[in-house]
UniProtKB/Swiss-Prot annotation:
Domain EGF-like: 2-29
Presence of keyword Ligase: no
Name of the featured protein: Toxin Bcg III 15.67
Localization per Swiss-Prot or TrEMBL: Secreted; Nematocyst
Disulfide links within the chain: 6-21
Gene Ontology terms: cellular component: extracellular region; nematocyst
Length: 29
């Protein structure tokens, strides 16, 4: 699965180990 780059507003809750980002709904948003 692909994700967006871990930058800006994504970095605080989307960042995953590996350089891509996916939405982590468990964090609340």
């Amino acid at each position: 699965d692909q994700g967006t780059a871990c930058t800006g507003e994504h970095a605080h809750s989307f960042c995953l180990n590996g350089g891509t980002c996916r939405h982590i709904q468990q964090l609340g948003e």
